[in-house]
Amino acid sequence: MILGLALVPSKSFQDEVNAYRKRYDNHYAQIMPHITIKPQFEIDDHDFNLIKNEVKNRISSIKPVEVHATKASNFAPISNVIYFKVAKTESLDQLFNQFNTEDFYGTAEHPFVPHFTIAQGLTSQEFEDIYGQVKLAGVDHREIIEELSLLQYSEEEDKWTIIETFTLG
């Protein structure tokens, strides 16, 4: 079973992000807009209830998270990914650090950069054109996310689905 943990924003902000993703993200149909808290990890099916309990325990002291998408940014030159940057907060860091440890399926491969991906899989020319447009349009969105979502990847459908949510705080 392949799982991941993410913060999923309100439907209205998902719609705003998806307006870009429909055009510029070749993974649009595979997963909803989200902030990755724990990248994919694999468990045995019989460990599922253990994972659910572990997630509940690890978030018991973490309050709902304020998310502020502040501007368009990118991961160039490492990869041609454009995203809405989310201001890093103590709560976001705490949530990320709870799940990116050796005792929970390993540490993160990359530093934590909270964001909502809006474009990926771009050529260099597409990247330059799209980044200029998105940067001009800008973003300034705030909301409180009260749940951490557990997602499962289906290899058959090549898609991520929320299978459980956990209330923060």
Curated annotation (Swiss-Prot):
Active-site residue numbers: H34 (proton donor), H115 (proton acceptor)
Chain span(s) of sequence motif HXTX 1: 34-37
Positions in coiled-coil regions: none
Keywords, in A-Z order: Hydrolase
A Pfam family hit: 2_5_RNA_ligase2
Enzyme category, top tier: hydrolase
Short sequence motif HXTX 2: positions: 115-118
InterPro entries: 2H_phosphoesterase_YjcG-like (IPR050580), Cyclic_Pdiesterase (IPR009097), YjcG (IPR022932)
Presence of the UniProt keyword Hydrolase in the record: yes
Domain of life the protein comes from: Bacteria
Enzyme Commission code(s) on record: 3.1.-.-
Disulphides: none
GO molecular function, one term: hydrolase activity, acting on ester bonds
SUPFAM superfamilies documented for this protein: LigT-like
Similarity remark: Belongs to the 2H phosphoesterase superfamily. YjcG family.
Listed NCBIfam families: PRK13679.1
Name of the molecule in the record: Putative phosphoesterase SERP0604
